[in-house]
Structures are given as C-alpha cells and as structure tokens.
C-alpha cells in the first residue's frame, strides 16, 4: 500500500461529511432507543458542525478571492470558486431543512410539508448544478443525491402528515429504484474484476484497483440496503428490533466511505482559501511532518553492513613471463592462464 499516494489524494471535504454523518447516526440511534435523553438540537450537533465548517470555509475563501484579484487568472480558479458558491447554496438549503426538522420534533407546531419545503427547492437547484458540474468536469455526488430524490421527499412528507396512508414499503419505492441502480453498479464492478483476474494481459496494479473498487462498492451498497430494509420493516411494525442493531449496517457503510476518501482525488481548493492540496497545506503549516514523512526504512541494513565490513579478496597476481629474444612482457589475467604455443620451425625449400 502506498501511504504517500493515499494522503496526497485525500479528500478532506468528503471525510468531514461522512464523519459528521456517522457521529450523528450514532447519537440518533442512542436517542431513539432512550439511552440518552438529550435534546434533538444536541443530537444534531455533528450536522451543525458540518454546516458551520462549510459557512466558515466559504466565507474565508470569498475573502481571499476578493482581496487577491491576481488569483482569478490562475487556470481553473474561477470554475472552482463558482463550484464552491453552488455547494454553499445547496448546504444552506439543507441547513434550513435540518433546523425545521429539529423545531418540528421539539415543538410539533407545523406541517411536515412545510418542513420539507427547502428540499423541494434544493432538488431543481441540484439539477441545474449537475448540468453545470458536468460541463466543467466537476464531482456530482451531493447534487445527484438531492436531485434524484425529489419524489421520495414528497412521499415522505405526505406520509408523515397522514395525507396518504400507504405502508412505508410503498412510500420508499423511489428509494428502491435508486438502490436497484446501485446494485447494478456493484454487479458491474464485480464482473469487471473477475474478467481482469482471468485476463493475462492486465498488469497487477489494474487488477488490484478493480478488486478494490468492487469490494468498496459492495461494502457500501449491501449494508446500506440492509439498513433501509430493516428500517422500513420497523416503521411498518414487522419487527421489534431496537434502533442500534438497525443502524449498524449504516455505520459500516459510512466507515467504508470514510476509508475511500483517502484514495479519492478532488476537493475544492478554495475552501478556507488554501488554494492547494490539503496534504501540501498541512506540510506547510507543520514543517516537522516533512521530517517524519520523508523517513525511509531499509530492511536489509544489517546485510549491507556485513557486506561493507567484509573486505573483498584481491585476485592473485601471477608473475609476468619474460621472453628474452623478443623482449616482450606477457601478463596473464587471473583464471585465464594458458601455456604459450610451441615454437614452430618452418624450413624453406632450396
């Protein structure tokens, strides 16, 4: 495993999102099971931290952009800055939805359709953002997630307000369609991994990459689908599981997603105005990390020392042979000594 490559391709934005979602899901499961009696405003603390980092990072990045006009002429700088602004807009709509959810749970004074209204707005915005990101070759994960689930948001809001009385298994039909597509993606990676394993024309690095991708997708999608099935069955009253066993598959998926951020390139360089890779930024702030990052270990060090200490024997020197008549000195190389040819007397006829 190339640790240097993993940290150079580290995506801090996705790592923060997955870590906050993991901590939030743990707190939510504990709160629903009654193990902790915190307010839901405290349970949502990881979500508030996530949105706070987004707002602060975008504010600092905008300040750096405004104070340094010379940066705007650097390659894809304008594209990255606009992508950051689009992401901030989507996150603000999500923040508004989360605040309304907490207020609705704590006070219960308004309809769920009103609570879901920011998500109804974020879906068309995400569709436009997907088109813009696709044209500029940007990542689309959050935008796609918000845009394809508009029908699911509507069904959930109607079901919570008891406008429709469908079972939750039917309410989540858009979710099952999306998960079916993800299962096809997993099957695609598995088939390609098998083909690459059986092919003799593929180098080992490509085989390893495809196997890693297949295992990653399988570890993400299968537990996530398991969590959704268990949750729907609990909401419909078909099982009496507590929330912690139901959330365990979700935690496994989120941990896998956190692990995949160490091998993903990307990330907007304008968050907090750093304008460079996160790994390089850390090395500039903490120079002592360079010393530990540049250490190399030689596992054959002792053998090399023995080789250096043992003197190499010199080849034996063979004394030169003299021939008096020709006055020529012939020196033989070691291991290649050969007798001189006999003297030939050729008699000339009269």
From Swiss-Prot:
Region (Mediates interaction with MAP1B) spans which residues? 298-350
Q: Which UniProt keywords apply?
A: Cell projection, Membrane, Transmembrane, Transmembrane helix
Q: Which gene encodes it?
A: TMEM185A
Q: Which GO terms describe its cellular component?
A: dendrite; membrane
PANTHER family reported for this sequence: FAM11A, B PROTEIN, TRANSMEMBRANE PROTEIN 185A
Q: Please classify the protein's predominant subcellular localization into one broad category.
A: other
- State the superkingdom: Eukaryota
Name by which UniProt lists this protein: Transmembrane protein 185A
């Amino acid at each position: 495993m190339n640790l240097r490559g993993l940290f150079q391709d580290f995506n801090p934005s996705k790592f923060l999102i997955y870590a906050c979602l993991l901590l939030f899901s743990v707190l939510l499961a504990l709160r629903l099971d009654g193990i902790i009696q915190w307010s839901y405003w405290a349970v949502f603390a990881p979500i508030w931290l996530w949105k706070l980092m987004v707002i602060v990072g975008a504010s600092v990045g905008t300040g750096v952009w405004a104070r340094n006009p010379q940066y705007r002429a650097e390659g894809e700088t304008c594209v990255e800055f606009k992508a950051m602004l689009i992401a901030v807009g989507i996150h603000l709509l999500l923040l508004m939805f989360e605040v309304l959810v907490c207020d609705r749970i704590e006070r219960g004074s308004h309809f769920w359709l009103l609570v879901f209204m920011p998500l109804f707005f974020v879906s068309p915005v995400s569709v436009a953002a997907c088109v813009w990101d696709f044209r500029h070759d940007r990542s689309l994960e959050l935008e796609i997630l918000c845009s394809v689930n508009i029908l699911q948001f509507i069904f959930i809001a109607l079901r919570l307000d008891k406008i429709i009385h469908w079972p939750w298994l039917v309410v989540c039909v858009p979710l099952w369609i999306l998960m079916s597509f993800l299962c096809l993606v997993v099957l695609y990676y598995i088939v390609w991994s098998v083909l690459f394993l059986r092919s003799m024309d593929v180098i080992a690095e490509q085989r390893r990459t495809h196997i890693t991708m297949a295992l990653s997708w399988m570890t993400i999608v299968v537990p996530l689908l398991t969590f959704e099935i268990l949750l729907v069955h609990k909401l419909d009253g078909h099982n009496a599981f507590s929330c912690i066993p139901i959330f365990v598959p979700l935690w496994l998926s989120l941990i896998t997603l956190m692990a995949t951020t160490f091998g993903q390139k990307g990330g907007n360089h304008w968050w907090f105005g750093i304008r460079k890779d996160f790994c390089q930024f850390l090395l500039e702030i903490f120079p002592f990390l360079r010393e530990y990052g540049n250490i190399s270990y030689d596992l054959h060090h002792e053998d090399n020392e023995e080789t250096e200490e043992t003197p190499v024997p010199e080849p034996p020197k063979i004394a030169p042979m003299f021939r008096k008549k020709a006055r020529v000195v012939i020196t033989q190389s070691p291991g290649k000594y050969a007798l001189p040819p006999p003297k030939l007397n050729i008699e000339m006829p009269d």
